[in-house]
């Protein structure tokens, strides 16, 4: 089993558990060049999202694949979720290690008002 298959296996396991709980979750995805985040309800509706591909985000950052960009995405997605009335969520790191960009996004989301 290679690294990607292991990550996807962890992600599937986590998503299944969160689905059973019926929790609203903050899902992240990262690529070498970009970072993406979505708040998804228990019935699979996307409530809020943010990514480094958005025009307003691109204007503020020079590179979409670093911690500064992840912090901005975390802050944006949290503000958008709180605006829609969602403050308590579960963090779905999509099998990625809680380190670097993933941790930076999570901390920024916590500071902006999300509880997890």
From Swiss-Prot:
Family, as annotated: Belongs to the universal ribosomal protein uL18 family.
Record's keyword terms, sorted: Ribonucleoprotein, Ribosomal protein, RNA-binding, rRNA-binding
Organism: Psychromonas ingrahamii (strain DSM 17664 / CCUG 51855 / 37)
HAMAP family reported for this sequence: Ribosomal_uL18_B
Protein name: Large ribosomal subunit protein uL18
Matches recorded under InterPro entries: Ribosomal_uL18_bac-type, Ribosomal_uL18_bac/euk
Keyword Transferase: no
Assembly and binders: Part of the 50S ribosomal subunit; part of the 5S rRNA/L5/L18/L25 subcomplex. Contacts the 5S and 23S rRNAs.
GO cellular component: cytosolic large ribosomal subunit
Function comment: This is one of the proteins that bind and probably mediate the attachment of the 5S RNA into the large ribosomal subunit, where it forms part of the central protuberance.
CDD domains xrefs: Ribosomal_L18_L5e
Listed GO MF terms: 5S rRNA binding; structural constituent of ribosome
One Gene Ontology biological process: translation
Matching Pfam families: Ribosomal_L18p
Keyword Glycoprotein: no
The gene coding this protein: rplR
